[in-house]
Amino acid sequence: MNPLKIRKAFLFLLPFVVMAILVGCSSDDPAEPTEAPAVSEPAKEAEPVKEAKEDDHDHADHDEDDHADDDHADVPASAKEVKDVPRNRTLVFTGWSDYYKTQHDNVENFNSWLPGNQHSRHAMNKGLTEYLFYTNLNNGELVPWIGESFEYNDTMDSIDVVLRDGVEWSDGVPFTAHDVKFTVDMVIANSPDMNRSSAWADMIKSVEITDDLHFTINLNRPDPRFFINQFGLGHENHTAIVAKHVWENEDAMTFNNYDPEKGWPLGTGAYELVRSTAEAQIYDRRDDWWGVETGFTDLPEPERLLFIPVADDDVAGQLYIANDLDYGPPLLKGTFEAAKARNDSLRSFNSEGPEWGAADGCNFVLIMNNQKKHFDNVDVRWAINLAVNRDEISNLAYEGGMPPVELPISSYGVKQYLPLMQDIIDKYDAGTHDLAKSAARMETAGYSKDSAGYWTKDGEKVVITLEIPSWMRPQGPILEKQLQAAGFDAVFKQGEPATIGDRLQMGETEVVWVQCGSINEPYDTFKSYHSKNSAPPGETYKGAVQGGRYENPEMDAILDEMEGMIHSPNDARYVELARQAAELYLRDMPVIHIAEEKHVVVQNEHYWTGWPGVEDPYAAPYPPWNGHYLITHNLKAAK
């Protein structure tokens, strides 16, 4: 499959000639272009942000439209002149795999607090936006940036924060505590319509300013993890502080944060946006960046960041082969290995397969609405779980690149808790594929098979409509076949992420999705199963990944106590609560975890070295994460 799949990419390239020109393809020597990528001429009209529902966890609920509108707007003629930058000083990247497009959208809207606007995770996080703190999730090390330090009080409901002195916005105005307070107040005032606004309104009582560099965040209740999760995890917590002196004069819900003549969008990062079109976003390095002026750190070596759209992983694979792409979407394992065979400059986080990729703290999960008929029965949910062959999905869909999981715990620091739960995991043995036990569960629940071999009760079949977004499509046909073999009337249906997300939030479908959260501790994932994140039938659920609508007062009480605790595998009470949560999850099986996401994140060393990997894990490698800004600063020109 693999070499053929790469060859098939050529069939797709003709419609994307403009894109190929943008990244500097050359018929004479495609691997060594010397000119900066060409830039298309600007157009005239602005495009509004696409409507979307609030998404309190960016990774878990992608509100993307994979088909760009026909009418795209480019930068007005008043935009800054774009200088020439050679290819070997330009870092070329694309969006993540949920951003497969032939053209960028929202090209004149950089209000990253509005749902549906994804610039903050696909481009702005690479160089324009800086966050208070980052975390190297490989070892848990905190990396202070525009924030210098923070400290909780003894009751864990107040955080004193110190900002770094000398930080400036790209227009030269100092970055201060007033910007932070303004941002927090703005987001809460616009709850629930802004990203993260529900979580902030629920947890943040107030922000008090001491002076320009000191402020305090007061919480409504103790939560020792809230600050770092919101302002310093380096994951998908895209909580960009906005410039008060600009935003206080605007309506935050309609402000597009874009005016080339005024230098908008402002950022404190080492790069500024100089052009935005349907074909490319261009960010050029600011040699007057505050980090150099204050002696904090050196300028990053890339002089330009070029963000281009790409149609799918076939096209991305061909661009990687031609050295026209430095990083961007992950490739399927086979596609990556075929591409690497043709270009030895390509690498991933791990130096060898089959698990080339790094963990992203998320699992693939089959979500069933626990309020719907059939799925409201724990025996039915367990029967479906026993029908799933996780090893087969891992091996056939992902060639062993996505390891099976049975508990809502992924990688990084949280894995230290798994040995403390192993006896419970062994007791339930949820990862076993056993059709006989599956059938026994269904019979216990009062079901019998009809003449076609499907499970029925009261004359009604158990129908499972497996709606799966495009980036998870490889597992669809396999899972469909497994469930059918177990007597469930299952149908795989590939759909658009935004449409599936809407239906999932309303509880209208069964979905294979992703659940994220378990980066540091069990609580960060189990909290999704709190009843407060559910909703009555027919209403939209409140939690980012609570599509299962699981409600259990026992689980609620456990999670309420864990919320106010500092996690530690050495804290006997915390460990006991985590074990109780794991036991309830495995007993009730509210959703079915299938495999751990370990994407083959591609890094091209032809023009740039210094990428993170197992040999130097200074940052997690995922392009959509805030921490990718640290990678931009670590890259070195290869030639």
PLM region spans:
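N-terminal lobe/hinge region of extracytoplasmic solute-binding protein
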Residues: 92-154, 185, 266
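Extracellular/periplasmic solute-recognition and catalytic clefts
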Residues: 187, 194, 206-209, 274-284, ...
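Gly/Pro-rich hinge or "lid" segments in bacterial periplasmic/extracellular proteins
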Residues: 117-118, 123-126, 134-141, 235-299, ...
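Ligand-site clamp/hinge motif
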Residues: 164, 259, 289-341, 480, ...
